[in-house]
C-alpha cells in the first residue's frame, strides 16, 4: 500500500453542516478548480485557502474550505471519476475528515489495524454506510 496526499474541498452550511464537494489529487488541479469556480483569482489568496484552510465565504451561513488528508492506495490504480472512501471522526456537530482510501478492502484492513475494538460485523456495516458512534465512512468520486 502507498500513502500520498489528497485535497478535500469541503462545503459548510450552518443548517446542513459539512459535506465533501470535491476530492482532488494534486495542488495544480486544485488551484485550477478554485480559480475557475470561485471569484478568487489572486494566487496568494488561493495559496492561503490551500495551505492554511482559510475559508471562501459564500454568504454569512456558508463557505468552502480545503483540507489536505492522507490517501492510502491499494494495488489498483485510482483514476478520475473512480469512487474513493473517506473516513471521518464524528464530532458534536461536524466531522473531522481524516483519511481517503482507494477501495473498501484497503479501508477494511486499516480499520482492522487502527480500530481493533470493531468487530467484523461493525466494520462491514461502517463501510456500507451505517455509521458508528465515533466514525463515519462516505464515498465520493475523485475529481482529478
Regions found by a protein language model. Name each.
Residues 7-9, 26-27, 92, 103, ...:
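Non-transmembrane, interaction-prone segments in cytosolic or luminal domains
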Residues 2-19, 76-96:
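Short aromatic-glycine-(Arg/Gly/Cys) micro-motifs in beta-strand/loop hairpins
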Residues 17-26, 93-105:
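A short, exposed loop/beta-hairpin motif centered on an aromatic-Gly-Thr core
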Residues 18-19, 36-82, 95-96, 111-144:
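Short, mixed-charge low-complexity intrinsically disordered segments
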Residues 1-45:
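Ordered, small/hydrophobic-rich secondary-structure cores
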Residues 30-33, 106-111:
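Short amphipathic alpha-helices within nucleic acid-binding modules
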